Design a protein with these regions (language model features):
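Extracytoplasmic/periplasmic ligand-binding sensor domains
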Residues: 161-170, 179, 185-193, 197-211, ...
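Extended ligand-binding regions for polar small-molecule ligands
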Residues: 32-44, 75-87, 136-140, 144-158, ...
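Hydrophobic alpha-helical membrane-insertion segments, chiefly the h-region
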Residues: 20-31
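Acidic, polar ligand-binding/catalytic clefts
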Residues: 78, 82, 86-87, 91-145, ...
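Generic beta-structure capping elements
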Residues: 61-65, 135, 228
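N-terminal Sec-pathway targeting helices
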Residues: 3-19
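Extracytoplasmic small-molecule ligand-binding "clamshell" domains
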Residues: 10-11, 38-118, 150-154, 164-188
């Protein structure tokens, strides 16, 4: 009887040991997977998909009228796809579109939005906040104290600017089709100030000797790569390559500066 109990106890101990090994192995595997995901390392299945689909051409809609990011076939967005092709062999059909028009629904799109919280399928590449500029050197501490001034904004930004600053009856907004028109209006003294995105317009600000008089950190543009919402290997490959590319690009920027 004692021998039987002893055997049963040994069996229970062995079962617990086996379960412990299985659980520990699962935790280790999960940690390795999470680490690989965080570093943009492709899984075996993803590598296999890439090898089998190198002849596949993936449609990507890409902004083509935004300085620095996508302009006449050059910029950050185009560099990303070129590096993606070079490193994986995947080919992309780059479908250009302009910011004033709707992009083709290709499933993969470089676009701009001003969301406070991005969706899971939107991969952030850069954030550019807005500034108020002027021909005169000054610092505005309180926007609400501006009196009897005309501010230039693009038509697409008017609602956003008004929502942020609220009602100020002494401020008049003149709207324009694009930033170039705003710059000309400011140079010709048709407006006192202008509100525009900062980084992509630095060349315009510096070349015209404009001054940044108010930094608007709560109004910004997100430059994102939007992928379709499906769970598949290609989407996973996109996300991991994005992680790898962003880390490399950041390190290259730090080294260069």
């Amino acid at each position: 009887m004692k021998n039987k109990k002893s055997v049963d106890i040994k069996k229970i101990i062995i079962i617990f040991i086996i379960l412990g090994i299985i659980i520990a192995g699962g935790i280790i595997s999960l940690n390795i997977k999470n680490k690989n995901d965080a570093n943009g390392v492709f899984s075996v299945l993803e590598k296999r998909w890439i090898e089998k689909n190198k002849s596949t051409v993936v449609d990507v809609s890409i902004l083509n009228d935004i300085p620095i990011f996508g302009y006449e076939g050059e910029g950050v967005f185009f560099d990303f796809l070129d590096d993606f092709s070079k490193d994986t062999g995947i080919e992309f059909n780059k479908i250009p579109y302009v910011s004033s028009k709707q992009s083709k629904d290709s499933g993969y799109t470089f676009e701009i939005n001003n969301k406070a919280k991005l969706d899971d399928n939107e991969l952030l590449m850069y954030t550019d906040n807005y500034v108020m500029i002027s021909k005169e050197s000054e610092k505005i501490k309180d926007f609400n104290k501006l009196d009897n001034v005309i501010i230039g904004v693009t038509e697409s930004d008017l609602t956003l600017v008004k929502e942020y600053f609220g009602n100020n009856d002494t401020v008049i907004y003149n709207t324009y089709n694009n930033v170039d028109s705003i710059v000309n209006a400011l140079k010709n003294n048709d407006i006192k100030y202008a509100i525009i995105p900062n980084d992509i317009n630095l060349d315009k600000i510096f070349s015209n000797n404009f001054y940044v008089v108010y930094n608007i950190t709560d109004i910004y543009n997100n430059y994102v790569l939007k992928i379709n919402g499906e769970e598949n290997l290609l989407n996973s490959i996109f996300k991991k390559y994005y992680i790898r590319w962003m880390k490399h690009s950041t390190s290259m920027f730090i080294v260069s500066t």
